[in-house]
């Protein structure tokens, strides 16, 4: 990836749909973060994935590579979080927009036009009688509005009324834009 970062072109938007330096940097950051956290949480000798060659310095190096790659992207001041000012709908719109070429958050995308270039996601989700849905684990992973885990008395109180635990006034607003809320069609 370092070679790709060195040789790819610099772009200031994603309209070309081509890989560029910042896409490679983002991929490097994601891989380095995954590797760092994997190694950090599997370094106990009784862990099935334990590797004695992985040192704390190596783990630190992965974290540092992740931070450096992210910093390189951020410091260019080209990309920014997509926002129309409506935090209760922006996340949903990010995934419902047909043309992402002018979205300042999107580094790289594939254009779908429905008539000529699409996907078979509905077919994949419905094979075998299943459907699109989310797991309890996914819902539980969303933090509260103040950034803390959703645990304890808060959970019990919210689960008394179906759907209350999904409310954007209680949880990260992205949760209510990821799952169907009671009353939504």
Kindly label every feature range from the protein language model.
Residues 1-7, 27-37:
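Glycine-rich, acidic and aromatic/proline-enriched surface loops and short helix-turn segments
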Residues 1-9, 69, 75:
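Long, amphipathic alpha-helical regulatory blocks in the mid-to-C-terminal portion
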Residues 7-18:
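Flexible helix-coil transition and linker loops at the boundaries of alpha-helical arrays
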Residues 18-22, 30-185:
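An aromatic- and glycine-enriched ligand-binding surface/loop that stacks and positions planar moieties
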């Amino acid at each position: 990836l370092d070679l790709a970062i060195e040789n790819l072109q610099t772009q200031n938007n994603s309209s070309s749909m081509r890989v560029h330096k910042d896409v490679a940097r983002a991929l490097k950051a994601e891989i380095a973060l995954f590797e760092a956290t994997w190694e950090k949480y599997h370094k106990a000798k009784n862990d099935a994935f334990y590797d004695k060659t992985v040192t704390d310095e190596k783990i630190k190096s992965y974290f540092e590579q992740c931070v450096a790659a992210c910093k390189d992207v951020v410091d260019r001041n080209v990309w920014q979080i997509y926002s129309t000012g409506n935090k209760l709908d922006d996340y949903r719109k990010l995934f419902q927009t047909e043309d992402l070429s002018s979205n300042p958050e999107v580094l790289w995308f594939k254009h779908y036009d429905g008539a000529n270039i699409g996907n078979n996601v509905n077919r994949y989700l419905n094979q075998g009688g299943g459907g699109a849905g989310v797991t309890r684990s996914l819902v539980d992973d969303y933090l509260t509005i103040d950034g803390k885990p959703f645990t304890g008395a808060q959970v019990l109180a919210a689960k008394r009324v179906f759907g209350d635990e999904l409310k954007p006034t209680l949880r990260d607003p992205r949760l209510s834009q990821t799952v169907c809320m009671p009353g939504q069609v």
